[in-house]
Regions:
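A short beta-sheet element
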Residues: 1-53
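A short glycine-rich beta-alpha junction/loop motif
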Residues: 9, 24-29, 64-87
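Positions in alpha-helical segments
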Residues: 28-31, 42-43, 77-78, 94, ...
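Low-complexity, flexible helical/coil segments
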Residues: 39-48, 66-72, 81, 115-120
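Amphipathic alpha-helical coiled-coil/heptad-repeat segments
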Residues: 82-126
Length: 126
């Protein structure tokens, strides 16, 4: 649980995630890393799935065919960056989660308004 999983050959497509489901068995094409206790898992997920990080880590890609270019686990782990204090990671990740939940709620409301609009337009032109 909270492990990071990525596909070395598909990192360019953002194939990286945090396991939020519990004990699972992943395909052998995925590499799995355990997150250090000094890093908040949700923050690490946000960091690793960010397009800026993926762009920077792709500098380590190796291979001769575009479809087969891959970032090795060793190169992935060699990437160094500074992390904020754990408390700041928690605040940041929780704030982003609340924003995400708000967006989902507003999207659901918008869908309802669009359905209502469609119904009213159909009723007008019977």
């Amino acid at each position: 649980y909270n492990d990071i999983c990525y596909n070395p050959a598909n990192l360019k497509f953002g194939v990286i995630c945090r396991n939020t489901y519990g004990d699972l068995i992943f395909s052998p094409i995925y590499v799995t890393f355990e997150i250090s206790n000094s890093v908040y898992p949700a923050y690490m997920e946000l960091f690793l799935t960010n397009a800026n990080f993926i762009g920077r880590i792709r500098r380590y890609e190796q291979g001769t065919v575009y479809e087969r270019m891959a970032v090795s686990p060793e190169d992935f782990l060699s990437y160094e960056t500074r992390m904020p204090a754990y408390e700041e990671q928690v605040k940041f990740a929780d704030k982003i989660q609340r924003i995400h939940e708000k967006i989902e709620l507003e999207s659901a409301i918008l869908d309802k308004y669009q359905s209502q609009r469609k119904y009213l337009l159909n009723a007008m032109f019977i």
